[in-house]
Amino acid sequence: MDKTQPLTTAPQLGQLLRAARKRRKLTQAAVASRVGLSQNRLSYLELHPDEISIRQLLAWCATIGLELRLGDRDAAATQDAAW
């Protein structure tokens, strides 16, 4: 089963990061220490994900068990239409 989720807005990214953290029962402080941020900064970034650096995003995803993938939007639409 494919659990990928397309993201088109920064707020969606914040919601996804927060939900994945909570599913793994990790506190903001635990994730922040592994990513190299303060708990306050991580909390801020969950609400303002447009300010997350790529380096922070990759470390954050690794910490909470997510994988970042990029794909061609047109190819995904073609696959969806085939179903």
Positions of predicted regions on the chain:
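Short, charged recognition helix plus adjacent turn
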Residues: 69-83
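Short alpha-helical DNA-recognition segment
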Residues: 25-43
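Short basic helix-loop element that most often maps to the first helix and adjoining turn
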Residues: 15-30, 59
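A detector for short, charged/polar N-terminal pre-domain segments
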Residues: 1-12
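DNA major-groove recognition helix of helix-turn-helix/homeodomain DNA-binding modules
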Residues: 55-71
